[in-house]
Amino acid sequence: MNIMNFFKAKKNQGNNSAAQDLYTKLNTEMYKSGSWRTEDNGEDMAIVSQVICQYWKPRFIIDHRVKCAYEFMDGSETLRTVKQDDIDWESLKGIPEDVINRARSLDFHFPLFVRKYENGVAEVSWQLNPDGMYYMDEDGYGMTDDDEVEIYGFIDRKGNVIVKFKNINEDWNQLKAMRKEAETIINK
């Protein structure tokens, strides 16, 4: 069975059996080379990434402690464990509508990083819009006046959002407070 048929057959990620089956499948040699790579992510967690459009994208979250895996992003670059309710829409006020629409569609075309797990949670940075240099060619043409927009949230070991994604406007103290909130929630 190819990987896409596997997901069609196992849509319900809440099903522990499906998560265990996915864990088994992702721990085969096929997902350790070529267009796939598995990297340690701290606390017995791992991220399985796939090359999509020439970039490594975090597709799956593996929890070695419980021998389960969860689809974080699908092959069409849509986030699977993040829902619209997991975004702090107030924090996005004042940014361009097309950027907000990327968040609405849960589009992960631009960089997204799942940082190392610490105290049961991982910080996720999700770039909704790159700065204008992203569009520049090797000769220096094509640059736009776009501003980078990146939002941050925190997830648990299953990829579920614990603290909503929000635009912190580079207020790193706010990010520290979000981490503390996530750790408090997860360790109740």
Language-model features and meaning:
Residues 18-188:
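Residue-level detector of conserved, function-critical positions
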Residues 1-8, 58, 176:
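Short, aromatic- and cysteine-enriched interfacial helices/patches
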Residues 1, 12-13, 184-188:
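Short intrinsically disordered terminal tails
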Residues 5-18:
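Low-complexity, charge- and small-residue-enriched intrinsically disordered regions
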